[in-house]
C-alpha cells in the first residue's frame, strides 16, 4: 500500500446506537386485533363447497327445491378467457377449472392423463 492511499473506516463498532423500543413504534390502531371477515356471498366459486359452513349450500338446496335455481345454473360453465385448457398459470382468477390439470380443449374439458411409463 502506498503512503498516499490511506484507508479510512466508514463505521465504528464502538459507537452503538440504542435499539428502538418495538412497542413505541406501534400506534393504537396497530394494536387493535382485526377480525377476519368473510364475504356475504361466496363469489369465488360457482357452487357451494362440499364442506360449506357459510350457509350457501343450504340456500342453494332451498332455491333448487323451490324451482328457482336451475341445474344448469349450477353447472360449471367454460371460462371466458380462453386459457382454461392451458393450466393454472394461464387461467383467470374466476376460472371454473382452477386447481385442475391442463387438458385438451377439444374434448369439452375432460382431463386426459398420460398413463404411459417414462422408462
Curated annotation (Swiss-Prot):
InterPro entries annotated for this entry? Anamorsin (IPR007785), CIAPIN1 (IPR046408)
Q: Which GO terms describe its biological process?
A: iron-sulfur cluster assembly
Q: Which residues form the signal peptide?
A: none
Q: Where does [4Fe-4S] cluster bind?
A: 81, 84, 92, 95
Task: Tell me if Signal is a UniProt keyword of this record.
Answer: no
Residues that hold [2Fe-2S] cluster according to the record:
42, 49, 52, 54
Origin: domain of life: Eukaryota
Please classify the protein's predominant subcellular localization into one broad category: cytoplasm
Q: Where is this motif: Cx2C motif 2?
A: 92-95
Q: Where is this motif: Cx2C motif 1?
A: 81-84
Localization, per the record, is: Cytoplasm; Mitochondrion intermembrane space
Q: Which GO terms describe its cellular component?
A: mitochondrial intermembrane space
For the keyword Cytoplasm, the answer is yes
What residue spans carry the region label Fe-S binding site A? 42-54
Region (Fe-S binding site B), start-end ranges? 81-95
What are the alphabetically sorted keywords of the record? 2Fe-2S, 4Fe-4S, Cytoplasm, Iron, Iron-sulfur, Metal-binding, Mitochondrion
Give the Polar residues compositional bias ranges.
1-15
Any Pfam family the entry gives? CIAPIN1
Q: Where is this region: Disordered?
A: 1-21, 33-119
Which coenzyme or cofactor does it need? [2Fe-2S] cluster; [4Fe-4S] cluster
Assembly behavior:
Monomer.
Q: Which family does it belong to?
A: Belongs to the anamorsin family.
- Relate the protein's function as given in its record: Component of the cytosolic iron-sulfur (Fe-S) protein assembly (CIA) machinery. Required for the maturation of extramitochondrial Fe-S proteins. Part of an electron transfer chain functioning in an early step of cytosolic Fe-S biogenesis, facilitating the de novo assembly of a [4Fe-4S] cluster on the cytosolic Fe-S scaffold complex. Electrons are transferred from NADPH via a FAD- and FMN-containing diflavin oxidoreductase.
Entry's free-text remark on domains: The C-terminal domain binds 2 Fe-S clusters but is otherwise mostly in an intrinsically disordered conformation. The twin Cx2C motifs are involved in the recognition by the mitochondrial MIA40-ERV1 disulfide relay system. The formation of 2 disulfide bonds in the Cx2C motifs through dithiol/disulfide exchange reactions effectively traps the protein in the mitochondrial intermembrane space.
Q: What is this protein called?
A: Anamorsin homolog
The species this protein belongs to is: Leishmania infantum
